[in-house]
């Protein structure tokens, strides 16, 4: 009996040592989750500035705070993290844009409003988790995103293909709430403001909407 107990004790120690040796470092492992997990909602307010293909060669002021090219905006987004590093987000933003070539005068704001919305599907990369490993108690996260979608001018009743990209930084202020700042660009086909453009190359006929945004993220579970 004593020999049997000794053999069982030795086997137990050996198995424990083996399990300890093969335990992976979960900090950098890739883990997926159920469909109901890790959803989030975001609401934000932004300042956006428009740079169109039609203004090329007219020497207009480039400041993003000029009245003829900038306006405030709002946004709403819903998304899900599929792994700690990769997620998807559907983002709707607008409402007040500008048609920069309205009268070629950078001293007036009259007549160049362009109400719009942009709907994008974006892939999000959590760079903090990607390069430093996942930590549940991390306060600050840095992310990047890129995507595509569609924009619509409600003023001119036109649609335009849209590409988007940017950086996103968030700070956890409660268990399920974070404050974020985001800087990004939406680059539209030229007909987002009902203009034809002046360049031969299609990439030069695009209207670019740069924005800086602040908002809140609510984690749903």
Predicted regions and their residues:
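Gram-negative (and chloroplast) outer-membrane scaffold detector with strong preference
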Residues: 84-162, 173
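Bacterial Sec-dependent N-terminal signal peptides
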Residues: 1-23
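Short glycine/proline- and aromatic-enriched beta-strand/turn motifs that initiate or cap beta-hairpins
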Residues: 20-77
């Amino acid at each position: 009996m004593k020999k049997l107990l000794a053999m069982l004790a030795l086997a137990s120690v050996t198995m424990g040592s083996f399990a300890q040796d093969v335990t992976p470092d979960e900090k950098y492992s890739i883990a997926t989750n159920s469909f109901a997990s890790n959803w989030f909602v975001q609401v934000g307010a932004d300042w956006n500035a428009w740079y169109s293909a039609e203004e090329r060669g007219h020497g207009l002021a480039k400041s993003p705070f000029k009245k003829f090219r900038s306006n405030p905006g709002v946004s709403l987004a819903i998304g899900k993290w599929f792994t700690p590093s990769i997620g998807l987000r559907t983002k709707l933003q607008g409402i007040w844009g500008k048609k920069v070539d309205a009268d070629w005068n950078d001293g007036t704001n009259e007549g160049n409003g362009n109400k719009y919305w942009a709907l994008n599907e974006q892939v999000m990369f959590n760079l903090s988790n990607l390069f430093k490993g996942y930590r549940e108690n991390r306060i600050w996260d840095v992310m990047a995103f890129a995507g595509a979608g569609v924009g619509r001018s409600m003023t001119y009743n036109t649609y335009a293909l849209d590409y988007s990209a940017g950086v996103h930084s968030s700070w956890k202020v409660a268990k399920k709430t974070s404050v974020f700042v985001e800087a990004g660009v939406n680059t539209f086909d030229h007909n987002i403001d009902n203009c034809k453009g002046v360049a031969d190359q299609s990439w030069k006929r695009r209207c670019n909407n740069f924005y800086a945004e602040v908002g809140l993220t609510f984690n749903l579970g």
